[in-house]
Amino acid sequence: PLPDSVQQLRYSLCRIAFDANHGTWGDRVDTLWNARLEKGSVCHPKASPDGRYLLYTVADYGTFPIWHRETELQLMDLQTGAIDSLPMVNSNRSDTYHSWSSGSRWFAFASKRGDGQYGRVYFAYLDAEGKAHKPFVLPQSDPEKDDLTLKSYNIPDLSATPVPFDASSIKRINRQLKAEEFK
């Protein structure tokens, strides 16, 4: 049954074996991070491209982590099971919605550490020993841009190649589309 309130909704982090050759799932489910024991909730687990680490978000409960001040990132070493609470990366404001670089040494994430209202893109480096280093905000050509922009960067995603469109292309297409009708 669903809890009476979203504040009681919590998700554990589990894994199950998968046989890619046969397209079948294993029978055993392993709980890697137990929501009941940890008194929190996990979301957005993403394995590094090299398969060594799992980066995920932890919040007090399980909905819309960017809205939770306490939300932070945690890093699990998939070889040892060790969990790093990333004290050099996390702030006292929402840190969530992450993505890995193709080389597994960098990750981008959204943080509200600046003003507490708007998510900004930060980058953190993960060295060969798995130690995360102090993040920095996405540089802007105008240093005041983030202070003057009333937009939030919620889900940064890293790409190895340039995207074949720009914001004005999306805006133009959006204006041409007919809105979905609800019946």
Predicted features along the sequence, with ranges:
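Sequence signature of WD/YWTD-type beta-propeller architectures
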Residues: 1-183
